[in-house]
């Protein structure tokens, strides 16, 4: 299996760098081939601008979706973007590894998504009609790929609990897991999250390293988060609202979009136990 490992941390000697090497060693031990995108080492350009679309007329107002669509269709995006798209096409699995900065992914990783998930590949796929609204949320170009997040956070685990001040970790990661990965069709596994990343000794690192190894061993077999498929009957089309008979009369929030309302962390604990 080919796994694209996208790493977004500026320091090779960091905790994240050490965790990455643990993941690499276990994935290779399982016989997987790793395709690496180390964004800081690559000097990845994070902003979308006119330079991304060399085929777009210089005197024409830049319309990013239209320019992205035209560039992708003619393989005329910049060389760095085309290379990443080639990696994605070759990969059977995707792992995004990053520290949680200001409740989201680092800007360099967001820029990788913005530039690489082109119109016609990451979005804008399939027919839009009264019967279906594109190939997305469970369908699309990533439909046969598995995906997972490896995340470090400085706060304590209770800070990210259902009643924690930072908000539930499932909610904070929802725009990435459901929006970035499930949107183009990937089967998204529960995340690996390490808390108190700035307060870790050798004994705890050894424990966390083994926990990460276990997740890498289960990459092919773990059950994905049971997100609801957009075109599977759970949503109205074209409004894309959850059907009124699903989720309960008072239910709301991100959990509605999972067929299993129990938190991801709870499901993962049950698997690990």
Segment roles from a protein language model:
Residues 1-125, 211-273:
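N-terminal beta1-alpha1-beta2 submodule of the flavodoxin-like/Rossmannoid cofactor-binding fold
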Residues 6, 20, 165-170, 202-210:
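C-terminal/domain-terminus segments
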Residues 37-44, 186-203:
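Short connector loops at secondary-structure junctions
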Residues 46-51, 160-162, 203-204:
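Short aromatic-enriched loop/helix-cap "lid" or pocket-rim segments at secondary-structure transitions
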Residues 89, 107, 142-143, 187:
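Structured loop/turn residues at beta-strand edges in well-structured enzyme cores
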Residues 93, 146, 190-191:
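Well-ordered beta-strand positions
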Residues 124-182:
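Short, glycine-/small-residue-rich phosphate/pyrophosphate-handling segment
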Residues 174, 179-190, 194, 219:
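Oxidoreductase and adenylate-handling cofactor-binding alpha/beta cores
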């Amino acid at each position: 299996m080919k796994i694209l490992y996208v790493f977004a941390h500026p320091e090779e000697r960091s905790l994240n760098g050490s965790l990455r090497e643990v993941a690499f060693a276990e994935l290779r031990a399982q016989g997987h081939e790793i395709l690496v995108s180390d964004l800081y080492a690559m000097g990845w350009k994070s902003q979308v601008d006119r330079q991304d679309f060399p085929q777009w007329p210089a005197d024409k107002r830049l319309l990013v979706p239209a320019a992205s669509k035209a560039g992708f269709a003619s393989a005329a995006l910049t060389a760095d973007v085309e290379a990443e798209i080639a990696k994605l096409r070759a990969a059977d699995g995707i792992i995004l590894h990053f520290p949680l900065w200001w409740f989201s992914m680092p800007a360099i990783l967001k820029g990788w998504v913005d530039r690489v998930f082109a119109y016609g590949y990451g979005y804008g796929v399939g027919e839009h009609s009264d019967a279906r609204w594109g190939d997305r949320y469970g369908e699309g170009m990533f439909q046969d790929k598995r995906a997972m997040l490896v995340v470090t956070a400085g706060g304590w685990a209770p800070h990210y609990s259902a009643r924690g001040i930072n908000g539930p970790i499932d909610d904070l990661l929802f725009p990435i897991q459901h929006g970035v990965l499930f949107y183009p069709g990937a089967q998204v596994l529960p995340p690996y999250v390490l808390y108190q990343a700035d307060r870790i000794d050798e004994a705890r690192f050894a424990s966390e390293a083994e926990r990460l190894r276990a997740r890498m061993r289960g990459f092919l077999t773990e059950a994905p988060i049971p997100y609801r498929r957009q075109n599977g009957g759970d949503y109205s089309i074209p409004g894309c609202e959850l059907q009124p008979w699903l989720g309960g009369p008072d239910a709301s929030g991100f959990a509605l979009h999972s067929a299993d309302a129990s938190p991801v962390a709870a499901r993962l604990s049950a698997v690990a136990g």
